[in-house]
């Protein structure tokens, strides 16, 4: 079991993107920082907002890239390479069109599924896709032509409440995730209903 050393929350920078569906991953990392009572601070070296906390004697780094989504890998690779963090010790939290709001799923490895943030991370890690993902469901607009405006839009209140609930569920299994006990975390998280 590999302990998680880096948790990345994907999103786009700037106030115009705050609270958009595409920033679900960043919201997750913000909630971790708040729970751990650490401040995310800008770090130009890693092209993002970073923080660090300790869990069972291990350092865990938080990262929200301040590059745009399709350049997230630049930020992730800079931090992972500097601290020699292997892909299997990274958890990337991101919005997931293929899951309904209120559903969160853990996954290890796989493709990018059309997600430009994941696509760039895989490329910047030297085509290594063996990192863990926290997929936060945002639903799908029903037509591929509507996806861009959908992910960059704010969710209606009821939908946002479901997303917030799925983040709460994910925070509940975070100790198991950090310890590398993904089987237990997946059993608990995947049985939750928002």
Swiss-Prot record:
Site (Stabilizes the basic form of H active site to accept a proton): 95
Site residues by UniProt (Discriminates between blocked and unblocked aminoacyl-tRNA): 12
Annotated organism of origin: Pseudomonas putida (strain GB-1)
CDD domains: PTH
Pfam short name (any one): Pept_tRNA_hydro
EC numbers: 3.1.1.29
Cell compartment(s), UniProt: Cytoplasm
Gene encoding the protein: pth
UniProt entry tagged with the keyword Cell inner membrane: no
Key words of the record: Cytoplasm, Hydrolase, RNA-binding, tRNA-binding
Active site: 22 (proton acceptor)
Annotated residues for binding of tRNA: 17, 68, 70, 116
InterPro entries: Pept_tRNA_hydro, Pept_tRNA_hydro_CS, Pept_tRNA_hydro_sf
CC per GO annotation: cytoplasm
GO molecular function: peptidyl-tRNA hydrolase activity; tRNA binding
Family, as annotated: Belongs to the PTH family.
Subunit record text: Monomer.
Enzyme class, first EC level, given as a word: hydrolase
Catalytic activity as recorded in UniProt: an N-acyl-L-alpha-aminoacyl-tRNA + H2O = an N-acyl-L-amino acid + a tRNA + H(+)
Its job: Hydrolyzes ribosome-free peptidyl-tRNAs (with 1 or more amino acids incorporated), which drop off the ribosome during protein synthesis, or as a result of ribosome stalling.
Protein name: Peptidyl-tRNA hydrolase
GO biological process: protein quality control for misfolded or incompletely synthesized proteins; rescue of stalled ribosome
PANTHER family assigned: PEPTIDYL-TRNA HYDROLASE
Highest taxon of the lineage: Bacteria
């Amino acid at each position: 079991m590999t302990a998680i050393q880096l948790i990345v929350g994907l999103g786009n920078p700037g106030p115009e993107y705050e609270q958009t569906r595409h920033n679900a991953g960043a919201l997750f990392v913000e909630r971790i920082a708040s729970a751990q009572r650490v401040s995310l601070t800008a770090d130009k070296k890693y092209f993002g907002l970073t923080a660090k906390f300790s869990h069972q004697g291990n350092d865990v780094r938080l990262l929200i890239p301040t590059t745009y989504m399709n350049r997230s890998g630049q930020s992730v690779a800079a931090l992972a390479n500097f601290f020699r963090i292997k892909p299997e010790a990274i958890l990337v939290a991101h919005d997931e069109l293929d899951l309904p709001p209120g559903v969160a799923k853990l996954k290890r490895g796989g493709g990018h599924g059309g997600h430009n943030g994941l696509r760039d991370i895989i490329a910047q890690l030297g085509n290594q896709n063996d990192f863990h993902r926290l997929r936060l469901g945002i639903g799908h607009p029903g037509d591929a032509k509507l996806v861009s405006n959908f992910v960059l839009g704010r969710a209606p209140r009821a939908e946002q409440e479901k997303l917030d609930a799925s983040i709460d569920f994910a925070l509940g299994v975070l100790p198991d995730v950090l310890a590398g006990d993904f089987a237990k975390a997946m059993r608990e998280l995947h049985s939750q209903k928002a």
